[in-house]
Swiss-Prot record:
Keyword Disulfide bond: yes
Function description: Probable neurotoxin with unknown target. Possibly targets ion channels.
Localization per record: Secreted
Protein name in the entry: Conotoxin Cal22c
Length: 55
């Protein structure tokens, strides 16, 4: 299977990471998920799809 998504606790929940993985798994190129929190101080988790070798 694909490697588990990176995330920065406590900002990114496992649910968010799983949802991102699901979203990205259908992407033909960027099928890996990377999650990070907003460095500006927002508690929001920002997840996006990346090429697997960019992780």
């Amino acid at each position: 299977g694909r490697p588990s998504a990176r995330y920065d606790a406590p900002y990114c929940s496992q649910e968010e990471v799983r949802e991102c993985d699901d979203d990205c798994s259908g992407n033909p190129v960027r099928d890996a998920c990377q999650c990070a929190y907003d460095p500006a101080g927002s508690p929001a988790c920002d997840c996006f799809c990346v090429e697997p070798w960019r992780r």
